[in-house]
Amino acid sequence: INSWILLQKDIVLRAFLKKNMKLPELFEEKMRRLLGEDFSEYEKHLDDPAYYGIRVNTLKISVEDFLKICPFHVTKVPWTDNGFYVDREEKPSKHPYYHAGLYYIQEPSAMTPASYLPVEPGDRVLDLCGAPGGKSTELGAKLRGEGLLVSNDVSISRTKALIRNIEMFGIRNDM
């Protein structure tokens, strides 16, 4: 019954947002120009549900070992070695594995930049837009404790989350 109620609330919310929420006019005009005939397909997908994901912290556990103990039903994100889709309803932020730093909660498309950067142990890496820590924690895991990771952000309030996530992940070669 709870799932049905959540689904009904989700449907009502989507209908309300579709009717009442509009893209900023200048943004919509620019996207129409850029996408041309594909704009209607783009617009149709704006109402799609957002994907939710987790990324395994390979500094603390291998992907294989994590999958053996994973308390959620997960599906591989195809463009990463350690990213998985997870149902938001499973509440991965409430699980002790999250608080132990075994995984990071991250929208799957946000996993892309750090997963494609060819960072290796011993490299020196600078993340200028580091908060809240998604890229930095993945880059730190790739460094495997060797080299240097400098993570920063212009927002002091956001750096608190960055520091917390770096510490939770066990990254020791960060400043």
Question: Where are the predicted features?
Answer:
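S-adenosylmethionine
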Residues: N2-M175
